[in-house]
Design a protein with these regions (language model features):
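N-terminal secretory/membrane-targeting segments
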Residues: 1-72, 86-97, 101-105, 150, ...
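Catalytic-adjacent loop/helix segments of enzymes that bind and process anionic phosphate/sulfate esters
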Residues: 46-55, 138-211
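His/Cys-centered metal/cofactor-coordination and adjacent catalytic loops
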Residues: 62, 69-70, 83-159, 202
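Residue-level detector of short, conserved catalytic/binding motifs and their immediate flanks
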Residues: 72-73, 169
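Catalytic glutamate of the conserved HExxH
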Residues: 73, 77, 81
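Short glycine- and Lys/Arg-enriched binding-loop motifs that mark or flank ligand-binding interfaces
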Residues: 77, 130, 185
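Short, solvent-exposed loop/turn segments at secondary-structure junctions
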Residues: 81-84, 175-177
Length: 211
């Protein structure tokens, strides 16, 4: 029930469960060797094209909006497989997303329509990578799974803590090891991670992936 285990690598626990410890050991060794080789072949000059592009395409902050939320609490609600058409949509006369409607239609709300799906095989983890770092996912597999454990990131939680003293927490209803979140969130600078083990996940409190 878990296709593409070796290409997308949802969770290392799944690899051991479905393929066995021996297969996982070989797989993990090969991935480690590949990553080490990539690091040894890397050169700082590889970044020149990236730096040049970002400098040429730099967008100045909008002065009327820059800093308007300084020192405010930041709450990010990340919805899985959600689409814009459900906002203000009614089914049988009832709003499908009443709470989101109240946020979207608020007088102090800014809404952005020039916003597109850019995820690859990493799916949800790619979306989280872009949200926190502005970086795209990998051509194959998940950045969370392949590179998230051994790297640190210029990520929003760390930047906000270093520059403005913010404390941070992330809440997710799945296992912490799924998409390697338990390791990646630390390297993003999150100070607290509350996964499924912190919730009462009986049938009354669950609906598919929702808690």
């Amino acid at each position: 029930d878990r296709p593409q285990l070796l290409t997308r690598t949802f969770d290392r626990n799944y690899l051991v469960k479905y393929l066995g410890i021996d297969t996982f050991t070989v797989y993990d060794g090969l991935k480690t060797a590949k990553n080490n080789q990539a690091r040894s072949n890397a050169d700082s000059s590889d970044l020149n094209k990236v730096i040049s592009y970002t400098q040429k395409n730099y967008a100045q902050p909008n002065p009327s909006m820059f800093g308007i939320a300084k020192n405010k609490n930041i709450i990010v609600i990340h919805l899985e497989s959600f689409q814009q058409f459900l906002i203000n949509y009614k089914l049988n006369g009832k709003s499908v997303t009443p709470f989101l409607n109240s946020l979207y239609n608020g007088k102090e709300t800014y809404s952005f329509s020039n916003f597109f799906n850019q995820v690859g095989q990493g799916k949800t983890s790619d979306a989280e990578t872009m949200l926190e770092t502005g970086a795209f996912g990998l051509p194959q597999g998940s950045l969370f799974s392949a590179l998230g454990t051994d790297n640190t990131f210029e990520a929003a939680p760390a930047i906000l803590n270093q520059q403005s003293g913010y404390s941070s927490a992330v809440f997710h209803g799945n296992s912490g090891s799924f998409w390697n979140r338990d390791n990646v969130y630390k390297n993003f600078g999150y100070q607290n991670f509350f996964d499924a083990s912190y919730y009462d996940t009986d049938s009354e409190n669950l609906t598919e992936y929702g808690v």
